């Protein structure tokens, strides 16, 4: 959520910055609402003060034995006018608040302008795509050779965009998860968390999935503020429960930065992606991910973004997977982000790089929604923290990359050295 003071006092500047994201701010309506809000605010304050004064006058008149009925009628009339003004003010503030919740974050000045992924800027590359002297198989065929990827069984159990893994493929999937968690907790300083996979309405508002992206969620009942406690949604990412741990909290400065990680399944309806990536594991309704979240002081958030991105890169480097680092343009960034790096891994069967991690600085956008603050040593007034999140990594897509990049001519898969301890010493599968 954007700073309300910016919307009140620097509306044209905000509109100009959001225009870089191809978002048209309704300046005229907002300005009109703000003018009316100010009038109503003054009116309610004046009516309240006048009503209080008349109420006191009733007591004084009563003690003097005077007729207080005219004053009572006046107090009642003031109360009716006050109630009407408050009702209008509350409705207007609610409308302004709802509109503010629909506004994306302001992009950082370093973010390039652009419309979509074609305008993103490549920052660097690591590793050289391997040259093969045999026909390249994709991960679906390799999984079938190993007997470990069964999409037909998943269709029978549930439907499209699900998978059943078994045997060595299931073990490799688990090994990747354990390797990522161990790397982030033992070398990168994150604290592992186990989290609920169902979250409530407030959590989804806190991280920005609601109200804009309700169609992307799987939910148990329609999500609204009045719903009972059974109105939950399956998490689209561990970012939601991890980040909401600091909702309505004041953190002491000495406790920052907070670095948290978790492995969870993620559930997404993939609304709007019909017909895209229908083969294999690339785009699933249910997939596993190891998530990284950092909570930092505002001055440290850009440095933290570089650090977090390097943590995701380290996973790819140790797995010997070629990738490129891309700075997203403002037209391709997520709703809550002010700056994002994507890591795209090389997939030989597609002869292209595909996203495997997205690392974002959210600045104070989520913190303001969640009222997540810290108290500095010098200034006792709590200030908003900055939050960051990143994939470290998407496990299913990492499995795809390992299968395709480390395939052999006979269809077997060479296990990267860092995974062999998690595979009971196996050097190959298939």
From Swiss-Prot:
Stored SUPFAM superfamilies: Class II aaRS and biotin synthetases, tRNA-binding arm
Binding site for L-serine: 237-239, 291, 391
Assigned GO CC terms: cytoplasm
Disulfide feature: none
Annotated compartments: Cytoplasm
Pfam families: Seryl_tRNA_N (PF02403), tRNA-synt_2b (PF00587)
Reaction(s) catalysed by this chain's protein: tRNA(Ser) + L-serine + ATP = L-seryl-tRNA(Ser) + AMP + diphosphate + H(+); tRNA(Sec) + L-serine + ATP = L-seryl-tRNA(Sec) + AMP + diphosphate + H(+)
Entry binding sites for ATP: 268-270, 355-358
Pathway(s) where this gene product acts: Aminoacyl-tRNA biosynthesis; selenocysteinyl-tRNA(Sec) biosynthesis; L-seryl-tRNA(Sec) from L-serine and tRNA(Sec): step 1/1
Chain spans, region Disordered: 103-127
Entry domain remark: Consists of two distinct domains, a catalytic core and a N-terminal extension that is involved in tRNA binding.
The name this protein goes by in its record: Serine--tRNA ligase
Organism: Sodalis glossinidius (strain morsitans)
